[in-house]
Amino acid sequence: MEHNDVKVGLSVSMSGKYRLQGQQALNGVSLWQSHTTTQGGIPVGSVTRPVRLVWYDDASRSGRARENVRRLLQEDRVDILLGPYSSNLTLAAAEIAEEQKKLLWNYGGTSDEIFSRGWKCVVGISTPASDYFRDLPGWLARQNPELRRICVLYSGKGTFGGQVSRGIIESAQEASYSVHSVPLNDPSSNPDLVLSTLRELNPEVLVLAGNFQDELAILQTRSRWPNTVRIIAAVSGGMAAFGSQLGQASEDVIGASQWEPGLSVSPTVGPSSEWFVDAFQKEFGPTPGYVSAGAYASVLIAAECVRHMGSTDNDALRSAASQLNCNTFYGRFQIDRPTGKQLGHRVCLVRWRDSAKTVLAA
């Protein structure tokens, strides 16, 4: 490859527990690459430079993600570094990015912990974890005001589940709900613990905040839950694979989604949602989910900052990102300047019925 290529690099989970989301992310970035290539590349100053994509499988492991990021920065010398999927892997990648003073464009790690360490290298694209279900108590108050008891089962591993739990606890307590938060580890290997917890608390609203596999394992025991449970919400309910993998057990489950094809957004940067969905389906087949959309949006935003500054210099791109306030098909982009935490983007609540997701009114 010629030295003037703009190299885009990422550590991505093509194996291990995040392989589904990793493939979705890679599809999103690959679509951006192919579309940008048809346009001749990225404008950098007075020259339009071709793009090159470099990625390595991290096998859903933090240690491998660190190795991959170090390789991307020291050997491949990428110009744009994208983060992996999952908060744990993003924390690992960000450690190396901060050490190497390289900006990390983060679509897939949403734990608030990522933005609380004083790092200057992370630019968040997606809504932070603590806001995933922050609007759920308000929705419940309008739709089911008689329900007052909420139980949050969250993953005790890592920081993501605890941050989701914190957000809903704060908003539920403000609305005078009774709320219990219970950490769980490996529920698939101990389903009786989940059942005993539910039978002890008898919640009316159950919220799950874990990884995809753990939430599926819990929901597969749904027929044995106490009949007090009237409303179910799960972080993974925002993913397209949720319904196909759970079948009837997904019925009426509420999810949190970073993006849905039907959302009305007028982009000021990049293509429309309609274009993205159509192009993605032509390239890969299925309708894209929010992981693919977020990955595409992250490199779209990075490229916009390159175009605006006429440079791939790290400090210049951080300055551009701090000043940028725009809409892409993925939603609004505006970060907190000191931390890089995303402020403008919003999640939406969705509900599964008849194997399909619908967006709930805000």
Residue locations for each model-derived region?
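Extracytoplasmic "Venus flytrap"
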Residues: 3, 9-32, 56-62, 153, ...
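Beta-alpha junction/loop-to-helix N-cap segments that form part of ligand/metal-binding clefts
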Residues: 21-25, 42-116, 186-191, 216
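Short beta-strand elements at the ligand-binding edges of bilobed clamshell
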Residues: 57, 114-138, 250-259
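Hydrophobic alpha-helical segments within soluble ligand-binding/sensing domains
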Residues: 65, 124-149, 190-191, 215, ...
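Periplasmic-binding protein-like
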Residues: 72-85, 105-107, 149-154, 201-212, ...
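An alpha-beta-alpha
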Residues: 121-183
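Extracellular/periplasmic periplasmic-binding protein-like sensory domains
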Residues: 223-294, 357
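Segments of small-molecule ligand-sensing domains
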Residues: 279-292, 303-357
